[in-house]
Amino acid sequence: MTGKSVRDVERYQAVLGSLLSEEENKYCADCQAKGPRWASWNIGVFICIRCAGIHRNLGVHISRVKSVNLDQWTQEQIQCMQEMGNGKANRLYEAFLPENFRRPQTDQAVEGFIRDKYEKKKYMDRSIDINTFRKEKDDKWKKSNEPVSERKLEPIVFEKVKMPQKKEETQQSRKSSPKSTEPVIDLLGLDAPVPSTLTNGRPCSLEKDLDLFASVGLNSDSRKVSGSMPTSGSAGSVPENLNLFPEPGGKGEEAGKKQLSKDSILSLYGSQTPQLPAQGAMFMAPAQMAYPAAAYTSFPGVPPSSSMMGGMMAPSVGVMAQHGAAGMVTPMAIPAGYVGNVQAAVIGVPNGMMAAQQAGYVAGMAAVPQPVYGVQPAQQLQWNITQMTQQMAGMNFYGANGVMGYGQSMGGGGAQGSNQSLSTQLWK
């Protein structure tokens, strides 16, 4: 290859490259595939490799295919490509193509479309002379053939829309008007409230209404009426001395009067006469009860009693046995106050069996003296607190001979108790 031919090949490649850089030649003329590298120079279109194979099958009398990079081009071939191009050729061969036509994608469909387009000339505008059409300049048809998205649109100048003056005036008035300063609400009540007059002329303040931590003493009178207990002197009313939560804002003299004392509590019980059930457990019967600290020897299953209520409760279960009947055990509950003395009590044992007054027949049974029934109800109620303190003061946890018991004194209610053992007390 001579130097002249080499320079011509380079020049032809430069021309083909410039043609491929145009927007209309960047896509295949038949299937719209991107980046065509083949061309049908007699028709003057750039096509993809798939469409190039179909064009070869049409025959050289219809289409002559060459590669852009691999084949050698002549000046005549380059001139045919410059005269046509994809846009101008489609305007000729696709003049009557339907508007909603969709490009085929499969090989068989593409082949049928190419044959209809170039072989049968189904969509061709036959009124156009091809030779004169080739010599026409591209400027006449490029503008009409270019898609709308590819055309260069002239810049549109928009006029400034003037806002109505009313809105501007209102905005300026809002900016110019000073912001109304609202008073700062003092929640802790540290600052003095600034009174503000209402329409009716009364001074008020937001701080005073919203003061959550105001002094409690201001509302002490209203709280006394609604929350505190009534202080009337009737029989069913509760005295002021029982008010355990005095008002913090009250006077010092009233707070001193409301201190608790024994006399006020006793006077409260003296003014009320409630109905009490006739049970022995409610009466503080004078008794000196001794429970053995160890388990009962006659009945190992009975544990030692560990409760100490000072005359309020008797042993919950008394186990009685008959002389001569070693295997017969009769458990029964003995409430305090109803069993006067165990020594002469006849228990409901079958076959008329009676508990004897001997030391071997009763195991772990404490003597329960008879309660005092001749006391008035008011006096019995007064025992509730005073005698309770006396019992706690006179309690003797450990008596003689290692026996745990209680010692209590009931003034006028019974005889003075003494710390004695269980055996001497029961069978004396």
Swiss-Prot record:
GO terms for molecular function: GTPase activator activity; zinc ion binding. A zinc finger (C4-type) spans 28-51. Residues 161-182, 222-258 are annotated as: Disordered. Residues 13-139 form the Arf-GAP domain. It comes from the Eukaryota. Keywords: GTPase activation, Metal-binding, Zinc, Zinc-finger. The keyword Zinc applies. PROSITE patterns: ARFGAP (PS50115). Residues 161-172 have a biased composition (Basic and acidic residues). One of its GO terms (cellular component) is cytoplasm. It holds the Pfam family ArfGap. The keyword Magnesium does not apply. SUPFAM superfamilies: ArfGap/RecO-like zinc finger. May interact with clathrin heavy chains. PANTHER family: FI20236P1, STROMAL MEMBRANE-ASSOCIATED PROTEIN 2. GTPase activating protein. May play a role in clathrin-dependent retrograde transport from early endosomes to the trans-Golgi network. This is Stromal membrane-associated protein 2.
